[in-house]
Amino acid sequence: MGKMNVRKGDKVVVITGKDAGKRGKIIEAIPDKNKVIVEGVNVVKRHSRPTRKLPQGGIQEKEAPIDSSNVMLLCARCHKPTRVGRRILDDGTKVRVCKKCGEALQ
């Protein structure tokens, strides 16, 4: 399995699927399964029985994971979806860079 180019907290845009074009922030990254959970994307409904914790029960909406290959990172400077490159700085630290404008991504 390849390395994921996105991390928790990154702003991304969905490029394929039913939520294509939606933008959001990554809530959770699951590298073992190569999946990410993006806020407001791939929202599913879960039916739950009444429990002590949730005496009402009912239908809850929550975000489900999507494959990390279906999202692209949004560059903070050029505000466009971009591929991620890596560059080693003079002091030896690795940084992710925008392939479109060359800006370092945090």
From Swiss-Prot:
Example GO CC term: the record gives: ribosome
- Mind listing the GO biological process terms from this record? translation
| A single GO molecular function term of this UniProt record | structural constituent of ribosome
Tell me what organism the protein belongs to: Desulforudis audaxviator (strain MP104C)
Q: What is this protein called?
A: Large ribosomal subunit protein uL24
InterPro entries recorded for this chain? KOW (IPR005824), Rib_uL2_dom2 (IPR014722), Ribosomal_uL24 (IPR003256), Ribosomal_uL24_CS (IPR005825), Ribosomal_uL24_KOW (IPR041988), Translation_prot_SH3-like_sf (IPR008991)
Q: Could you tell me which CDD domains the record lists for this protein?
A: KOW_RPL26 (cd06089)
Give the organism's phylogenetic lineage. Answer: Bacteria, Bacillati, Bacillota, Clostridia, Thermoanaerobacterales
What job does the chain carry out? One of two assembly initiator proteins, it binds directly to the 5'-end of the 23S rRNA, where it nucleates assembly of the 50S subunit. One of the proteins that surrounds the polypeptide exit tunnel on the outside of the subunit.
Its quaternary organisation is: Part of the 50S ribosomal subunit.
Q: Which UniProt keywords apply?
A: Ribonucleoprotein, Ribosomal protein, RNA-binding, rRNA-binding
- Family assignment from sequence similarity: Belongs to the universal ribosomal protein uL24 family.
- Is-annotated flag, keyword Ribosomal protein? yes
Question: Sorted alphabetically, which Pfam families does this protein's record hold?
Answer: KOW, ribosomal_L24
